[in-house]
From Swiss-Prot:
This is Major outer membrane protein. GO terms for molecular function: porin activity. Signal peptide: none annotated. It comes from the Bacteria. Transmembrane segments: none annotated. Disulfide bond interactions within and between MOMP molecules and other components form high molecular-weight oligomers.
């Protein structure tokens, strides 16, 4: 499952956070 916050950051439930280009 992947969740995107309001700032467009890709937050995965495995704890990794990635910036959405």
């Amino acid at each position: 499952v992947t969740v995107y916050d309001a700032e467009g950051t890709k937050v995965q439930l495995d704890g990794s956070i990635r910036l959405v280009m």
